[in-house]
């Protein structure tokens, strides 16, 4: 073998040794990269878990005043007579309703824990009472039949709220409390398919609050976002709609009649409807005998 050939062979051997030594280096480098990826992945998972836990803590907010306000609304003269589920539940047990049942209501789920809700309800000045075990709540004051005329005088119609969002009801209540004053209820108006119409009836606690609000918006119109609201008294709205549709043919709505606890109590009152029913049947029987055609005329 010539000297040149020997040099070439030595060079090839050296090159192969270098390449073979680079393979484990590359493999080692790959392992390091994979290890870094795994570490980064684990860190991201931990961050995501922590974020979810933080988000969960944020959702489980608690405000005693807000809890008490919401539950007192459920048992108020404005709501209870028309809340069929709550009324029926309360009538099964001398007015008592399980606090856990109320805690499961959509507006109440964000308030935790249950013990804190119980403590908040115990601070009701006069409307509510909690049993000794802290398991049930009921209304202490007798239910008052609200005069429809009084409700009309305290109510306002507002339109221009756009599409409904998850927090629209809460946002509307805060909006009117901040811009007008104490409210009894904000009723979101819906069509036959239960879609929000973008308008509401606001029932204030006092007629003066409603009147001052109507005077205020005459010179300082209110906006919801970028849209100016249409605002008038409920009576004005009802009269306007009646005039607009006075010549229309009768319209039959698929909506169910609103539940009325007072009518239910009237039905259960002994003698109130039973006597009336007997008189009605007797009168119908008498009229039927008078109007029944004779055999000859048939």
Curated annotation (Swiss-Prot):
Keywords: Nucleus, Phosphoprotein, RNA-binding
Organism lineage: Eukaryota, Fungi, Dikarya, Ascomycota, Taphrinomycotina
Location(s) in or outside the cell: Nucleus
Gene Ontology cellular component terms for the protein in this record: cytoplasm; nucleus; ribonucleoprotein complex
UniProt feature, compositional bias: Basic residues: 275-284
Domain HTH La-type RNA-binding: 57-148
Domain RRM: 154-236
Plastid is among the record's keywords: no
Biased composition (Basic and acidic residues): 1-15, 24-60, 259-269, 289-298
Region of interest called Disordered, as start-end residue ranges on this chain: 1-60, 242-298
Residues recorded with modification Phosphoserine: 61, 124
Function: RNA chaperone that binds to tRNA precursors and promotes their folding and maturation. Also able to bind misfolded tRNAs. Acts as a regulator of tRNA methylation: binding to nascent pre-tRNAs inhibits the activity of tRNA (guanine(26)-N(2))-dimethyltransferase trm1.
Stated name of the protein: La protein homolog
GO biological process, one term: tRNA 5'-leader removal
GO MF entries: mRNA binding; RNA folding chaperone; tRNA binding
Main location: nucleus
Key word Phosphoprotein present: yes
